[in-house]
Swiss-Prot record:
HIV-1 lineages are divided in three main groups, M (for Major), O (for Outlier), and N (for New, or Non-M, Non-O). The vast majority of strains found worldwide belong to the group M. Group O seems to be endemic to and largely confined to Cameroon and neighboring countries in West Central Africa, where these viruses represent a small minority of HIV-1 strains. The group N is represented by a limited number of isolates from Cameroonian persons. The group M is further subdivided in 9 clades or subtypes (A to D, F to H, J and K). This is Protein Rev. GO terms for molecular function: DNA-binding transcription factor activity; RNA binding. A motif (Nuclear localization signal and RNA-binding (RRE)) lies at residues 34-50. A motif (Nuclear export signal and binding to XPO1) lies at residues 73-84. Gene3D superfamilies: 6.10.140.630. It comes from Human immunodeficiency virus type 1 group M subtype F2 (isolate MP255) (HIV-1). The RNA-binding motif binds to the RRE, a 240 bp stem-and-loop structure present in incompletely spliced viral pre-mRNAs. This region also contains the NLS which mediates nuclear localization via KPNB1 binding and, when the N-terminal sequence is present, nucleolar targeting. These overlapping functions prevent Rev bound to RRE from undesirable return to the nucleus. When Rev binds the RRE, the NLS becomes masked while the NES remains accessible. The leucine-rich NES mediates binding to human XPO1. Asymmetrically arginine dimethylated at one site by host PRMT6. Methylation impairs the RNA-binding activity and export of viral RNA from the nucleus to the cytoplasm. Phosphorylated by protein kinase CK2. Presence of, and maybe binding to the N-terminus of the regulatory beta subunit of CK2 is necessary for CK2-mediated Rev's phosphorylation. It comes from the Viruses. Residues 36-48 have a biased composition (Basic residues).
Length: 116
C-alpha cells in the first residue's frame, strides 16, 4: 500500500486474511431456544467478538509496526473556549456552523468550575 516504508503488501494482505478467518469463525448465534438461552448465546458471542477484536489489533500492530488507533488530538483548555456570535449570527450557511472560536481573555460567566 502506498506511503509505507519497510512493509510489503503481501504481509499486510496475509494479516487481513488471518483477521477475516477469525471473524468468519464466530458467526452470529441462531435465534432458537428460550429467551434465556438466546441471551446467553449472544453474551458468549459478544465475548468472543471482543477477544477476536483484541487479537486482530495485535496482528495489525505486529504487521504494521504501529498502533491501529489514531493519535489523540490535543484540545485547548476549556477556559479559553468561547462562543462568539457578535459578527454573523443567523448566517450559519455561509460559514461552518459551530466553528470554534478561541478567545484569550477569561469570562466570569463561565466561572472557574470549582464549587464553593
Amino acid at each position: 500500500m502506498a506511503g509505507r516504508s519497510g512493509d510489503s503488501d503481501e504481509e499486510l494482505l496475509k494479516a487481513v486474511r488471518y483477521i477475516k478467518i477469525l471473524y468468519q469463525s464466530n458467526p452470529y448465534p441462531k435465534p432458537e431456544g428460550t429467551r434465556q438461552a438466546r441471551r446467553n448465546r449472544r453474551r458468549r458471542w459478544r465475548a468472543r467478538q471482543r477477544q477476536i477484536h483484541e487479537i486482530s489489533e495485535r496482528i495489525l500492530t505486529t504487521y504494521l509496526g504501529r498502533p491501529t488507533e489514531p493519535v489523540l488530538f490535543q484540545l485547548p483548555p476549556l477556559e479559553r473556549l468561547t462562543i462568539n456570535c457578535s459578527e454573523d449570527c443567523g448566517q450559519g450557511s455561509e460559514r461552518g456552523v459551530g466553528s470554534p472560536q478561541i478567545s484569550v481573555e477569561s469570562h466570569a460567566a463561565l466561572g472557574s468550575g470549582i464549587k464553593e
